[in-house]
Structure formats: C-alpha cells, structure tokens
C-alpha cells in the first residue's frame, strides 16, 4: 500500500507528536510545527471541530513507558484494552505517575475498559463490569468476539445493559 509500518516505539512517538500537531491545528488559526517527524508552516485546518476546544482524544493500550506517558500528556480518555482487574489497577497507578510527572490531574482522564462478554454466562460479564467499576473505570465497552451467538445483541440489551447501568449508578 505504500504506507510504512514503523517499529512500535517510533509509531508511539509519532502518535505523541501527532497529538500535539492536531491540537494546534484544531485550536489555532494557523499552525507552525517543527517536530522530529512532522513539520508545518502556516498550516490551516478548516472548518474547526464543533466540539470545543476539540473532540476528545482516546488512546488505548497499556505500554508503561510510552503509551501511558503519551496518554498522560494528551488523552481525554484512556482505553484499557483488556486483561485482569488487577492489571488495570496497576496500569492506572502507572498512568497517575506519568500524570504527576507532566503536572496533569489524572482525574481529567476518563478510564475506559473493554470487557469481554461471556456468552455462556452474561451474569459473569456483569460481575466483571462491577469489579472494573469498583476499580475506577468510568466508561465501559462490551467487547463481542466472533463467533457471535444468534440474538446476542438483543440479549445484551435485555439482560446486561440494565444491570450495568445499575452498577454504574
């Protein structure tokens, strides 16, 4: 396709720089930027986003050295892409350390979690949701994996969503 696939560390550094660049484009009439990977001179981005100051930045992943540091600097939402509640709690602590290092209130970052749906036991899914909410999750994504059982979306709407809303309070 002609699009280079950079090594993981470089991809993440490019992401961090791109976040800076995009925020400039969305908040200034013209933007100048001279980064390691991207350069702009008197660049414009029109029309500006309707959401002010700009749409939320969502960053997912759990890499402690780069991803969570970039999240601390730029994200409005961090998405924990899966794993145990204890791993989530550890990653949140690391994120808070990165926030402290850049002078940011970690409470400004919404904590999103992807929760795998247990098709055989939807009650177990609700219990998992409860554990993540108790651990500080503020946003939940019910993660459906193929093969999808017939009627699963309706079952989730009827059996899980009302109970999840009750958990979220």
Residue ranges, per PLM feature:
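Active-site-adjacent structural elements that line small-molecule/cofactor binding pockets in enzymes
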Residues: 1-169
């Amino acid at each position: 396709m002609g699009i280079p696939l950079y090594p993981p560390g470089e991809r993440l550094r490019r992401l961090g720089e791109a976040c800076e660049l995009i925020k400039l484009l969305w908040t200034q009439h013209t933007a100048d930027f001279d980064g390691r990977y991207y350069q702009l001179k008197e660049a414009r981005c029109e029309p500006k986003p309707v959401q002010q100051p700009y749409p939320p930045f969502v960053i997912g992943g759990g890499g402690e050295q780069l991803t969570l540091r970039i999240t601390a600097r730029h994200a409005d939402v961090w998405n924990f892409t899966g794993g145990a509640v204890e791993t989530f709690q550890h990653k949140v602590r690391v994120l808070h350390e990165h926030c402290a290092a850049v002078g940011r209130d970690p409470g400004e970052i919404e904590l999103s979690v992807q929760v795998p749906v247990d098709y055989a036991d939807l009650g177990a899914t609700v219990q998992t949701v409860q554990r993540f909410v108790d651990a500080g999750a503020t946003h939940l994504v019910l993660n459906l994996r193929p093969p999808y059982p017939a009627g699963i979306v309706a079952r989730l709407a009827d059996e899980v969503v009302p109970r999840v809303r009750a958990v979220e309070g």
